[in-house]
Amino acid sequence: MLLFEKVGVENTEKALELALSSAKERGLDVVIATTGGGTVPVVLELAKKLGYEGKIVAVTHAFGSREKGKNILEPEKMQEFRDKGVTVVTAAHALSGAERGLSKKFSGIYPVEIVANTLKMLGQGTKVCVEIAMMALDSGAIDYGKQIIAVGGSGRGADTVCRLTPEYTSDLMGTKIHEILCKPSLEE
């Protein structure tokens, strides 16, 4: 496992190289997190450079997550990515979604949020990898029961890559993390 010195966007290119190389070697789909779309052009460029011809799925926030009726990822960018062969998934966060609404209203914490925060003990990106993999599976963008390479981050960019077999959110504890290829150190 490669351990980056710190979290952040400066790890993006190396994380994506690891993700695509591993996916190519193993014949796996790649699922990446994207908020505003900045990581997608980088992964497409590196995929071409490295000869990765497999499926790329970009998972972004649900509509209304920041502003009602809108998505953070602009519709033009979504279409541009689709035109380049990327499957774009917009969905509620698998490890918060409706539970976050309950915890805000009733000032508590609920089981799925506990799972999310437990995964964050390995870093924000590890939580994101598990979450986007389940979101992609729930949407039908990836095949059930197959390993994938998931790429997450801690804010902007990518800094965590996991090889995992996701489960549907209705059976989230069945998700298996087989390998963490890279992640940032959590040293302060």
Predicted regions and their residues:
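Conserved mixed alpha/beta catalytic, RNA-binding, or beta-rich assembly cores of soluble enzyme
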Residues: 1-188
